[in-house]
């Protein structure tokens, strides 16, 4: 299939999302608990913990990248990054961030807006010690 065909047909491509509507009465009063319920339904066969993290800085504007969720706490979501990375510097200058999970097999996305904070230095060191050196 060549690119010409794909680009001329892309406007007609549509998946019917029919798994059902989201009803407030069926949701947990706690957004974190609801997220955990949905998260536990997922299959670990793909990067089910992948999320798009969006940051902003005056210099770079909005930047999006995929990071991996590593923990869910009572007060938020945990991911790790190098403190010298662009995303870390952007969060340092403006900690208003957005994350988005997309789970196509569940026909669901979860969007979260909030403030990012550094976890303890001890927790960060513990995590990075478990990782392969060049990862």
Regions found by a protein language model. Name each.
Residues 2-135:
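Binding-site signature for planar aromatic cofactors or substrates
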């Amino acid at each position: 299939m060549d690119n010409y065909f794909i680009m001329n047909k892309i406007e007609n491509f549509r998946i019917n999302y029919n798994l059902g509507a989201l009803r407030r009465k069926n949701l947990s009063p706690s957004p974190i608990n609801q997220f955990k319920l949905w998260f536990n339904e997922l299959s670990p066969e793909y990067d089910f913990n992948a999320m798009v993290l969006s940051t902003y800085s005056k210099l770079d504007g909005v930047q999006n990248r995929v990071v991996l969720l590593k923990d869910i706490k009572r007060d938020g979501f945990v991911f790790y990054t190098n403190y010298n990375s662009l995303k870390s510097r952007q969060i340092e200058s403006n900690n208003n961030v957005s994350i988005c999970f997309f789970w196509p097999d569940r026909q669901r996305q979860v969007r979260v807006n909030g403030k990012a904070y550094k976890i303890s230095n001890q927790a960060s060191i513990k995590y990075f010690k478990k990782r392969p050196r060049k990862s």
